[in-house]
Amino acid sequence: MKINQILVSGMALALSVASLSSTAKMTTDEIAQLGVTLTPLGGEMAGNADGAIPAWEGGIESAADAGYPDFKSSGHHPDPYEGETPLFTITTQNMAQYADKLTVGHKAMLEIYPDFRMNVYPSHRSAAFPQRFYEATRIAAATATLNATGNGVDNAVKGLPFPAPKNGLEAIWNHRLHYRSDGITIRNIGQAPVLRNGDFTLVKIEDAGVPIYHQPNTTVDNVDNLVIKFKHKVLAPPRLAGTLLLVHDTLDQSREPRKAWIYNPGQRRVRRAPNVAFDNPAIASDGLITHDQYDMYNGSPERYHWKLVGKREIYVPYNAYRLHSDKLKYTDIIRPLHLDPEHLRYELHRVWVVEATLKEDTRHIYKRRTFYLDEDSWQIMHVDQYDNRNRLWRVSEAHVINYYEVPVLWSTVEAHYDLQSGRYIAFGLNNEEDFTVDFSATHLSESDFSVAALRRDGKR
């Protein structure tokens, strides 16, 4: 197998340049290539040289397109690729053969954990989004700019701001602002901090969000520096049940920090929660992830220097419908040291590589982070995180599916592995839940994401 070369997109001319001086709006000619030689979000339409990565042909655009026309939100999504078998399996014994298409994190997991393996399946570029998001992206691409600090995006709403990123900040903002829904979404999920021996206590969460940036009535003038308002309600275990978290996530957090409030059922009061950001430990996570690791990365980019390294072909979790299946129990999935590889699906895809290096005058438990972003969706698929001695510490994966009733590509499970302790945390589990996710929760309104509503919820 040939050593993988950095793949350079003709629209991203300064791949290694991280300075803000390299940012520029897309030209009319560049925008005209969206949907022609490039996907509507800026990925390469063509497949790769040997055909292992197919051309993008629109992805799965509906439940009918997936082969399940009667499917509705709130259920477990049937697998469009059921019956496929792995092309091959990567193990510690044969990993050298595939080294050019493995991340540092996956190499480490294969070396450290003798039972970890990667079943590699045929690649399907299933990512798809509503046409209105594609149209909004064409508009945003002509006007969007990073602000003076790079900590926010100006002159863009509803669409992806930078389909042809010129630097690392633009790429990471694409992830932060990529489409998840334009209606209120609610889901029931589980979070499992796993001990080294495989024991865990499941934390059940009701998670809801209103995507301000993507709503149909949002304009540049009324977006009010907001990306999303979201609320977590802990349902179990009993010692945590009733804990509520409300977050108003801002576009430019250096100008206006993220606003967060928490309701503690023991104290029966709402208080501000300024620590719900950056490297503070996430709620009920046993310290295994930081707040800015949810959705693989969230919040302000201000503590890092960002560098766009280029594009690579690597094996990433993709089309993880088996992991999402209601035929599995949580104990089928969660094993000592890592998720059961039997239920994981990896495919070869092109990704953007972004390096984040901690600024000298700031602090974070991760000195360096390497992000791998799917070219078809801008979802972060994998992250390698290094400690302050520059040693690989934690490895994160987003196991994604196309929620084809929308459609939207998003994680069904995030797995964050601590290689130094042998522990990990899985977030997003819903196999044993009767209700999974509803992308148009009409029984909720934006007023349900206010401090007053948080107080009311706490008293119920």
Q: Which sequence ranges carry the predicted segments?
A:
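N-terminal signal peptide c-region/cleavage motif recognized by signal peptidases
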Residues: 19-22
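Gly/Pro-enriched, hydrophobic low-complexity segments
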Residues: 25-59, 103, 231-299, 336-442
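Solvent-exposed N-terminal domain segments of exported/luminal and surface proteins
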Residues: 28-258, 264
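Bacterial N-terminal signal peptides that target proteins for export
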Residues: 1-9
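Long, C-terminal catalytic modules of enzymes
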Residues: 432-460
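Extended beta-strand-rich segments in extracellular/periplasmic secretory proteins, especially
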Residues: 188-236, 292-371, 381, 387
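N-terminal charge/polar-biased segments
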Residues: 14, 24-25
